[in-house]
Amino acid sequence: QGRAPHPPIPPAP
């Protein structure tokens, strides 16, 4: 609502 949904972060190796 106040914060925009962040894009999915790929898992680091």
Swiss-Prot record:
Protein family according to the UniProt entry: Belongs to the bradykinin-potentiating peptide family.
Protein's name according to its UniProt entry: Bradykinin-potentiating peptide 13d
Functional description taken from the UniProt entry: This peptide both inhibits the activity of the angiotensin-converting enzyme (ACE) and enhances the action of bradykinin by inhibiting the peptidases that inactivate it. It acts as an indirect hypotensive agent.
A molecular function GO annotation: peptidase inhibitor activity
Tree of life domain: Eukaryota
Key words of the record: Hypotensive agent, Metalloenzyme inhibitor, Metalloprotease inhibitor, Protease inhibitor, Pyrrolidone carboxylic acid, Secreted, Toxin
Biological source species: Bothrops jararaca (Jararaca)
GO cellular component: extracellular region
Location in or out of the cell: Secreted
One Gene Ontology term from the biological process aspect of the record: regulation of blood pressure
Modified residues (Pyrrolidone carboxylic acid): 1
Tissue: Expressed by the venom gland.
